[in-house]
Amino acid sequence: MKRALIVLIVLLAATGAFAQVDFAAFESGFESFAQDLSNGLPFNSSTGLNWSPAYIGQFPHFGIGLTVGATTIPYAAMSEVFTALGISLPSELNFISKYGIPIPAYTIDARLGGFFLPFDIGLKFGYLPPGVLQGQSFTADYFLIGGDIRYALLKDHGFVPAISVGLGYNYIKGGIGVPGLLSGPIQIADFVDPRDNSKHTLELSNPSLGMQWSASVLELKAQISKKILFFTPYLGAAVSYSFGAEAGGGLTASLLYDGATPSASQLALINQAYGGTVNITDQSITVLKNSDPGFDYRAFGGLSFDIFFVYLDIGAAYDFATSALGASVNLRIAL
């Protein structure tokens, strides 16, 4: 997760000096980014519990481990923001324009075999408290919790693979901020007072860039796997239903109106002119976007290698709705 965060921060920090921003471009850019991020959250919340065995067996079989992964959102979602803020993509990060911007995720995940019937239960949890990264070049917070129950249609034995179906629930919430990202104040061009058509200067002093997201997702999945000596390849498919995801981004800064803090009436006029999806206060300009409740579809698969009771899983996933990619690594102890 740390590597994916570093890539994202380097991407955001690749900025030069500039003086003025077109507000319409800023609004459109952040609105597009927030929409694409909210659309990609159900996919990101699926990180964890995608272990190679389609069924681990009944109790006392169990396992616990750590999963680290990332999913992508299309680069086009962020390119409008970069254009509006005068940010250029560094040449060493050109691969992002092709594969997308990585959004990291991690979980501690565990599975326990069921009693009497052939099922297993999984739980996962990931948490990065606000303030843990204080003093770094960025701030981040992260929370992911979820679980599932899988029922074995077939058990792995002889030439027969294991096949299971499962139902799960995931909730994800997080945010990232980059203080002092932009060099110097930003001017928002040509604010016109509708009362007298006079032009005024809006300026953001020492702005910081921030993003926030949350989603609640129900998931139905099926998986097939086959243990061959020390290896277990697997494939799966999932249909998820999002109850609605929310994502947003913007700038936190002191807003100045002709060089002074705006009054309540001036803020009301500014919001009237630029409002809608944008929320403007004297401390921030942010855009929030909700994705409608709906279905999402993904395929996943990978391979695990085990020595005695230690397993290493390498997995990949593809989201059909957003064309996003995902990858994860899981290290666990399982009996």
PLM feature segments, named:
Residues 60-62, 104-110, 143-149, 216-222, ...:
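Hydrophobic, lipid-facing positions within transmembrane beta-strands of outer-membrane proteins
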Residues 21, 291-335:
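Predominantly the C-terminal beta-signal and adjacent terminal strand-loop region
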Residues 20-148, 153-155:
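Transmembrane beta-barrel domains of Gram-negative outer membranes and organellar outer membranes
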Residues 1-4, 155:
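Positively charged n-region of N-terminal signal peptides that target proteins for export
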Residues 12-19:
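Sec/Tat signal peptide C-region and signal peptidase I cleavage site
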Residues 62-66, 119-123, 147, 161-167, ...:
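Transmembrane beta-strands of outer-membrane beta-barrel proteins
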Residues 68-72, 114, 125-131, 153, ...:
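Transmembrane beta-strands of outer-membrane beta-barrel pores
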Residues 74-84, 88-101, 130-142, 170-218, ...:
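Extracellular/periplasm-exposed beta-strand and loop segments of Gram-negative cell-envelope proteins
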